[in-house]
Amino acid sequence: MKHVNYLSFFLLTLFSISFISCSDDDDNKLNTGITNQSWTEGKSLEISQDNELSVSFNAAAKWVASVTSGADWCKLNTTSGTKGQSTLKLSVSTSSTTDRTARISINIDGYSPASFEVTQKGTSVPQTTEDMEINAKVDEYLREMYLWNDEYKTLNLDHNKGYEDFFYDALGSMTTNTLDKKTYVGSDGKTYYNLFSYIQLLPNISSTRTTKIVNKELAYSFGITGITPISIGTQAENTIYFCLQGVYPDSPASEAGLKRGAMISLINGKKINNNNINNFYYDILLPDATINYTLTEDVVEGGTITGQKEYTITSKATYNNPVIFSNVKEDIEGHRIGYLVYSGFEASFDQELFNVFKDFKNKNVTDLILDLRYNGGGHTMSANLIATCIAGTASQGKVFSSLRYNDERMAKLNNKREDELFAYSSYPNLGTSLSAGSLNLPRVYCLVGNGTASASELVINSLEGIDLDVILIGEKTTGKNVGMEYEEYTVRNNTYRVVPITFQSYNAKGFGEYEKGFEPDILMDETNPYNEQGVFYIHKY
């Protein structure tokens, strides 16, 4: 009997212990292990775009958190923690036009899960601006065509920016596009950069088709081909001049009497200084409307300023023929020397350019001086025309240039560069053979400077690729071994042209690494052609 009572007591005790243990487990299952939380049960917390939300609580053990609904837009910046006072951080990077809710779950070891809700309030539908529309088109084009599109695709872009800021900020922020983004050290010791790629809003003026492929384009201009800023004097006291590189025939500048070499000291009565030089420079070379300027020239005779002369000029929409000047000097020690000043590779003027080479051929020129000092480039097809006419039959069937695109485009070409041949037999833009302008020269003399770039350098490189002797006279060239394929978009009656770098060019020998420029065979500074010592020139800008 005692044995039975003892056993009954033991079983009763064991049952009681088990019941107590089970009761504790049930309590934990109902208990979240969270105290002192900063949210209120049943009330949603508000979260907004780009503002991190922090919630706090005390955890009974280590914990993990997750987004159980709304994970496509709500992000946890903190996903786990340890026992004690804890903070959970959340963020949202996008907006929504309607209210949306996410649920956050916190699981503490050995306890039931807890959850709370966050709500992002909907905003009104954003007004789509013209900038946003053109930025979307530009973004799509750059993703496909930009030579360094791999890095470009990783950028976090703001389509709300103005179209120029959107374009230049994006490409300027990149690091792999060193052939586009040229760095330099300013006078203040800081590093700056220039981009070859650009975007522009085209003027609303009509064009006339003049060749088979390219239109002549009307553009506002004073008719000044280029400007060389020069500082004269001492470092403490000097005058900044705009030295005119040349003027286009029948232009406002030529009609006013301005000539190459004019030293402009005042613009609208103001001296040129470091604060206004950039604005004056671009306003004179690239006016975007009809505007008036009064230019004051310091008249220099025998190295002395003898007076001043004023010119009032008005920009107008015009076609600027890049064939500035050409002639032939005959019978110089048995040579007939052709001379061509060419300011830009404008394919719409290819007929005028080809006419010059036909004239050279008819006059049996034996030597050619090609003046590219102020030629910053243009259409590569026009570079092919010039190079082919110079080399003549020696160029037939040979590679003019070989193009490398971005990796995606190269994959479609089986990673083989795309070759373009010299256009001797057929030049598509004129629909004719170039034999009538073929000079068959063994060498060419090129006048070059630091503004000689792109298609100008392409002519040099392509001719050297077929072993034609190219003699460079002047200063080191720019070093632009890359080219562009532009696209135009019309948005709300405005037309934009986006011109990014899309390829690198190589010659027939596979050489294309001239990003530091071509060094001249004969060095000559045109502001001091005789290399005199102690002259008053300080520097060119």
Give each language-model segment a name:
Residues H3, L12-T40, Y111-M132:
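Bacterial Sec-dependent N-terminal signal peptides
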Residues T35-V67:
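Solvent-exposed, low-complexity, repeat-rich "mucin-like" stalks and linkers
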Residues S48-V55, S95-R103:
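Short, solvent-exposed loop/turn segments enriched in Ser/Thr/Gly
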Residues N58-T87:
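Surface-exposed binding patches on compact interaction domains or structured appendages
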Residues L88, T98-G110:
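A short beta-strand micro-motif common to beta-rich folds, especially ectodomain repeats
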Residues I108-S115, G303-Q308:
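Short, exposed coil/turn segments at beta-strand boundaries within extracellular/luminal domains
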Residues V125-D367, G376, S382, C389-Q396:
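Flexible, low-complexity junctional segments that flank or bridge functional domains
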Residues I337-L340, F349-N355, F360-D367, G376-Y541:
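C-terminal "post-core" interaction segments
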